Amino acid sequence: MAKNLNTVSFTVLLLVLLMASTGILETEAACFKFLGECGAVPFPGTNADCTSCCVGNFGSAVCAGRVEVEGGVKHCHCYGTS
């Protein structure tokens, strides 16, 4: 039993190291930094309109623009990597 557990643990460790070294684990998690708001409040457009507004204001650092409701009012929130 212990030998099987050691083999499984070693295999899992190798898989995690392989995934980390090849960048497989990289996701859009880097896209969680709030850059600011964009456009009018309440924001009248869609997520695509929001992303366009964000790119216009914040440049290439933007990886997502989302219309989110705060207190019943729609806002355009910009998220990026820097």
Curated annotation (Swiss-Prot):
It is found in: Secreted. Keywords: Antimicrobial, Disulfide bond, Fungicide, Plant defense, Secreted, Signal. One of its GO terms (biological process) is killing of cells of another organism. Residues 1-29 form the signal peptide. GO terms for cellular component: extracellular region. Disulfide bonds join 38-63, 50-76, 54-78. It comes from the Eukaryota. Belongs to the DEFL family. This is Defensin-like protein 208.
